[in-house]
Amino acid sequence: MHHALEQVQKTGFICNNLLATVALPRIGKKQIKPLEDNELCAFLKEIRGDTYELVYFVIVFTGLRQGEVLGLTWDCVNFEKHTLLINKQHGKKKGTCEYCFSSLKNDRPRLIEAADGVMDALKKQQIRQQRWAARLKDGWENSDNLVFTTETGRYLCNQTVYLAFKKVMRRLHLDATRFHDLRHTYAVNSLKSGDDIKTVQENLGHQTAAFTLDVYAHATSSMKHESANRMDQYIHNVTKP
């Protein structure tokens, strides 16, 4: 609107652009709420045996977005090198009821090296899928080679997984926790474990390390405090009489 009135002003139809003096309200950042260690332990215990246990597990220990983990295909999983190629996502096409693959949020594929526990979870999922496929034979539907599917091989609906997650969180009395907070939990724990910001940025698929720093400023502030405490202890040790 501001730009449109500016163009009209140049033609002489109006003398002043009244919107030029209007200050837009600042949009506050959404506060991130990663799971605390005790909450994460309770969550992992609660999801044991859950239909989507391995989906949640992979997200919380890789930081993948929901669409990225639901769009992961077996050709992008390298068990020998312990790597995952994240090059697409899967979800509902905007304005339709159709589910399909689409490009990543930043349109930048990334290769991440996953922890042993994550690869073990994926191997477990592979074996489970093979068992389902053997039982259904010609009825198996996974033509897209998806890692996470229903027992018939169909894709998982984002909303179905989300609603199941919210039920878990309600049982844990953590109703305010959002699905995306699993990704935040991974990021904060990575930083607290000593991963450098560039590695965390690349694993998360952020455009820049500066963006990652901005989003997780509270975590890095905590790390600075811990660093100062370690230095204080070091000074104490080297200056002892």
Residue ranges and their predicted role:
Residues 76-83, 175-176, 195-217, 225:
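Short, polar N-cap/turn motifs at the start of nucleic acid-interacting alpha helices
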Residues 11-17, 26-45, 81, 87, ...:
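DNA breakage-rejoining catalytic core of tyrosine-based enzymes
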Residues 26-30, 34, 89-92, 119, ...:
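Catalytic-site neighborhood detector that most strongly recognizes the C-terminal catalytic loop/helix
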Residues 1-20, 65:
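N-terminal DNA-binding recognition helix of tyrosine site-specific recombinases/integrases
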Residues 89, 115-175:
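Active-site/catalytic core of tyrosine-dependent DNA strand-transfer enzymes
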